[in-house]
């Protein structure tokens, strides 16, 4: 379909950069189709070409909305990656990227040191290990996470939440996602101010919860399910 090879819109970013069919929505769908048929691709879940194709998928889900058939390549990617690496060693880069939600709270405690190290040879080595482009540097951690800001500025607190606003106002729970919590806390701070001015009280969880999406994207399905269960129990 023509939209799979479009030069504008959101679908598909990996094709728009590489101009290679195997990195398009259509290309990935065809590879999976051939895998299921088993005539051309005979090694099933172990096929390295399909794995390479999905490694370049950003899991942005643009195909879910822009593709006429609403194919959800991101979901197929998660399932394929889980099966492909079930019995083989993963690339080293998968682990820090998949577990970034667990790593960031620890790294943010030493944000100044981490940011300084990123600027030198260690930063370049980290980019190489993570498989990131050398054209742009690693993002800088904020001096203070949103959760720490909430701890210092909350109107009151209880065992689970830092709370802002009057107790007789409707309550909104503001989930501090991993990226905004540690890289762009000012966005969440602004969200608190907007909610307060709109007549709400705001609750911010004391414990940081990663949504589990990075785990899911890399095919760590069991770990992602465990993370979601932890969130629901929390």
What are these regions (language model features)?
Residues 2, 36-40, 199:
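Alpha-helix capping/termination and helix-coil
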Residues 31-32, 36, 213-216:
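Gly-rich Lys/Arg/Thr-decorated short loops/hinges at beta-loop-alpha junctions or inter-strand turns
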Residues 41-234:
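Iron-sulfur-cluster electron-transfer modules
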Residues 1-34, 62-82:
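Iron-sulfur cluster-binding cysteine motifs and their immediate structural context
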């Amino acid at each position: 379909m023509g939209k799979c090879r479009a030069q504008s819109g959101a679908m598909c970013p990996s094709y728009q950069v590489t101009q290679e069919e195997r990195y398009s929505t259509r290309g990935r769908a065809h590879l999976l189709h051939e895998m299921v048929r088993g005539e051309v691709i005979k090694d099933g879940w172990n096929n390295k070409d399909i794995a390479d194709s999905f490694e370049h998928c950003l899991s942005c889900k643009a195909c879910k909305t822009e593709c006429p058939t609403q194919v959800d390549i991101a979901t197929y990617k998660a399932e394929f990656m889980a099966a492909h690496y079930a019995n083989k060693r993963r690339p080293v880069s998968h682990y820090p990227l998949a577990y970034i939600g667990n790593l960031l709270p620890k790294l943010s405690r030493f944000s100044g040191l981490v940011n300084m190290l990123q600027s030198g040879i260690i930063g370049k080595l980290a980019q190489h290990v993570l498989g990131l482009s050398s054209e742009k540097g690693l993002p800088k951690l904020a001096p203070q996470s949103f959760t720490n800001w909430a701890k210092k500025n909350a109107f009151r607190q209880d065992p689970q939440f830092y709370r802002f606003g009057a107790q007789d106002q409707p309550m909104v729970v503001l989930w501090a996602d991993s990226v905004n919590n540690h890289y762009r806390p000012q966005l969440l701070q602004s969200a608190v101010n907007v909610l307060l001015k709109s007549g709400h009280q705001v609750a911010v969880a004391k414990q940081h919860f990663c949504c589990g999406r990075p785990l899911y994207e890399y095919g760590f399905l069991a770990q992602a399910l465990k993370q979601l269960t932890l969130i629901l129990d929390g």
